[in-house]
């Protein structure tokens, strides 16, 4: 599943399907 852009404006790799949130990882 793809992830939306995080608050920092970067694509995140880890996502939570329950709340559909994304965390930015470098």
Swiss-Prot record:
GO MF, one annotated term: ion channel regulator activity
Keyword Secreted (UniProt): yes
Disulfide partners: 3-22
Keyword Disulfide bond attributed: yes
GO cellular component, one term: extracellular region
Family: Belongs to the three-finger toxin family. Short-chain subfamily.
Functional note: Binds and may inhibit nicotinic acetylcholine receptors (nAChR).
Protein's name in the database: Nicotinic acetylcholine receptor-binding protein Mnn-1A
């Amino acid at each position: 599943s793809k992830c939306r852009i995080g608050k920092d404006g970067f694509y995140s790799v880890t996502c939570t399907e329950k709340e559909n949130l994304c965390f930015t990882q470098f």
